[in-house]
Amino acid sequence: HDGKPLAVKLQYPDMESAVEADLNQLDMLFALHRRLDPAIDTREIAVEIGARVREELDYRREASHAKLYAHILRDVPEVRVPGVWDDLSTGRLLVLDWLEGNKLLSFKTGDQEMRNRIATAMFRAWWHPFSQLAIIHGDPHLGNYTVFGEGEGINLLDYGCIRIFPAKFVGGVVDLYRGLLRNDDAQVVHAYETWGCKNLRRDIIE
């Protein structure tokens, strides 16, 4: 487009039907798990997974998420977010700026300072939106990152699985972290209960 390299994400035909079939199978597995161990209500887990997976089929939503992250991370130079080409994108076609970079694993033999810099950038890309705005990038696999320059920072490439949580959930994360840090079982249990877990036993927590 105007001689500029772009990244194009095109949805496979009939993906919606394939996704619904997989989610139905998952519901059956969760129902079986509830009968074997009712301590964790897997119905809410199934609803959450279903909602996130269905959202990934909506590329307009993903475009909005990419813009949101570009705004959130605008003052974090070690994390780059591709721009969205709205005039070329649709609900099943997403067109983004092409960000030059190399695979994350190609830097695993780099010096310690470089690896620390990359790891810090990855942490900030995940933690800053979550801790400040309760927004989490829910698909942090290696294919969703590349590294630009000589380990100067990361390109964050995929925004299909983004979750905005209520403040209560973030409080649960903080409680869990502090409970584990202090070996405080009561605080750990409270954190899990905040997330909807019930009738917790020590063996489940451990």
Predicted regions and their residues:
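Conserved catalytic cores of large enzyme domains
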Residues: 1-206
